[in-house]
Structures are given as structure tokens and as C-alpha cells.
Amino acid sequence: MRLSYVSLTLAIIFVMAIVHAPETEAKAYPEADAVGEASAVGEADAVGVADPGVGSLLAKAALKILKIVAPAAAEVIANKIG
């Protein structure tokens, strides 16, 4: 048997097992014996430190290079990004 036939055979066996599996049905009882209790307590402290990151540093470097190469384009981009 070649490898491609093995995967096809396993797929057919899997489908046949699903199709011919016995049907089961869940039975629900009318009395409720479940007890539920929930509580939620939360505290959060947010302290943020601004880190420029690599992307921001690369963008600033690219803008500096662009100012040297094409000053008009750099001015337009600088006005758009603020």
C-alpha cells in the first residue's frame, strides 16, 4: 500500500465509524440539584511607562533620512503623522 492510499483508507474508516456509531441521547431530569454561587472581586493598578519601541525608532530614523533625500515629501509625511 502506498502512503496516499493509507491516508485515504484511514479517512474512509473514520467516516464509516462516525456514520455507524450508535446514537446516544442525553436525558434531563426535571429536579434541579445544582447549586451555584459566584462572587467577583477585582482590583487593578495601572502604571504605564512610555517606551518608544523599535518601530518608533525606525520610523524616526526613516523620517530623518527622508528629510535629507526628499524634503518636500518629508514635510508632507511629518504633517500627516503630527
From Swiss-Prot:
It comes from the Eukaryota. Residues 1-26 form the signal peptide. Keywords: Amidation, Antimicrobial, Secreted, Signal, Toxin. InterPro entries: Pilosulin. Residues 27-52 form a propeptide. The modification Isoleucine amide is found at I81. Pfam families: Pilosulin. GO terms for molecular function: toxin activity. GO terms for biological process: venom-mediated paralysis in another organism. One of its GO terms (cellular component) is extracellular region. Coiled coil: none annotated. It is found in: Secreted. Expressed by the venom gland. The keyword Kinase does not apply. Induces paralysis 5 minutes after injection into blowflies (L.caesar). In most cases is not lethal 24 hours after injection, but paralysis is irreversible. May have antimicrobial properties, like most ant linear peptides. Belongs to the formicidae venom precursor-01 superfamily. This is U10-myrmicitoxin-Mri1c.
